Amino acid sequence: MAIFDNYEVWFVIGSQHLYGPETLRQVTQHAEHVVNALNTEAKLPCKLVLKPLGTTPDEITAICRDANYDDRCAGLVVWLHTFSPAKMWINGLTMLNKPLLQFHTQFNAALPWDSIDMDFMNLNQTAHGGREFGFIGARMRQQHAVVTGHWQDKQAHERIGSWMRQAVSKQDTRHLKVCRFGDNMREVAVTDGDKVAAQIKFGFSVNTRAVGDLVQVVNSISDGDVNALVDEYESCYTMTPATQIHGEKRQNVLEAARIELGMKRFLEQGGFHAFTTTFEDLHGLKQLPGLPVQRLMQQGYGFAGEGDWKTAALLRIMKVMSTGLQGGTSFMEDYTYHFEKGNDLVLGSHMLEVCPSIAVEEKPILDVQHLGIGGKDDPARLIFNTQTGPAIVASLIDLGDRYRLLVNCIDTVKTPHSLPKLPVANALWKAQPDLPTASEAWILAGGAHHTVFSHALNLNDMRQFAEMHDIEITVIDNDTRLPAFKDALRWNEVYYGFRR
């Protein structure tokens, strides 16, 4: 995905006319230098665009108003180069509906000990200008991020870049359309929820489309297009004998390709970037979409099974966040456990739909195997193991009065044995701090059995996501202890109860 090319972040300098035109000229000069350097050297995901100085209430209000109405603007980075009285910012910040980051930096890194004078002090006032800006943010109860560090510092670059990913993701989410092919898996609770509340909170819309409408598009795909896509399969994957030309399951592969092309066309025509399916609503489809869903996820689409629109939306959001980063992000499900003293493990998978972006194999296996659930023809699927190393699993749940994001930090490990009779992609991990604590905390907090699994993102990314969307986050990691975790759940209940 080249989604960051569609957005820019505005760089706004706060000052005032008290210091005279020469000081403001130097402020502008410094700002131009910093923005050019950051765009050239900081490896930021999208471009910084310098805006005119904000030196009066009207100028600041105009910048904020323009940011709201510019679809390319993903957010504002504000630098208080000099002191900028914060009452000037009230009207602008009141109307601002884009993410905001305060870059608490200054042009010089070291103090010029021998030459420092009051002119230098008046020009370089971030130390207390930033505090004035911080006060008005706190007074207005306005969520904004703060990054402190010199503008040439790589850690500051990384933090700004991480925030930019969140800002772009938030703007993308406001336009996100989730398509549900069929409804919720019958009688399942956690995959359901309030779609109106979700659209109010996050911006994404969720609507159902009839499977019959999808089938009509699938059936319109030409044999030539199907054969061309299967040629791509053969170059990208290791085909089992049954799936090769003249193999007994070759027709199933052709049908999977037809479904993939039909699904993609349907999603593109409807402007959808996330979708769900359910094995209980497949009328007219010859097989449960496995391979098609896997490949669409790898192309950046959000997905979840059984009508789970919240996880599908979260996957799309996290796909956008992680664009260009190392490691993959996938739909996942905690499936079964391996209990062994000191080596408890979780085997994650799903019936078919795990994204190849997390595969360790360069060429996953493409196979067709029997699947009793759904009552359709044997579906095609990609089979692979997962990369090892630190990862997270995240779940977004609807508690009725609010949304809760659960994040468990995990360590993925190599599968110690082959799985000859398990023809699905899988991931094996150790939950932090340990399986009993992690699973009990997850259950107590109401976490879903569906998650988004990511090697590319980390806990800090998800904390930023929760803060930017003003939702509760519950963390399970090596520092988690159940008594304190239970207390935190109780405190959160009181805190969010007061905010209703």
From Swiss-Prot:
Binds 1 Mn(2+) ion per subunit. Keywords: Arabinose catabolism, Carbohydrate metabolism, Isomerase, Manganese, Metal-binding. The keyword Protein biosynthesis does not apply. Its EC number is 5.3.1.4. InterPro entries: Ara_Isoase_C, AraA_central, AraA_N, AraA_N_sf, Fuc/Ara_isomerase_C, Fucose_isomerase_N/cen_sf, Lara_isomerase. Its cofactor is Mn(2+). It catalyses: beta-L-arabinopyranose = L-ribulose. Pathway: Carbohydrate degradation; L-arabinose degradation via L-ribulose; D-xylulose 5-phosphate from L-arabinose (bacterial route): step 1/3. One of its GO terms (cellular component) is cytosol. Pfam families: AraA_central, AraA_N, Arabinose_Iso_C. It comes from the Bacteria. The keyword Manganese applies. GO terms for biological process: L-arabinose catabolic process to xylulose 5-phosphate. Catalyzes the conversion of L-arabinose to L-ribulose. NCBIfam families: PRK02929.1 (NF002795). Homohexamer. This is L-arabinose isomerase. It comes from Shigella flexneri serotype 5b (strain 8401). The lineage of its organism: Bacteria, Pseudomonadati, Pseudomonadota, Gammaproteobacteria, Enterobacterales. The gene is araA.
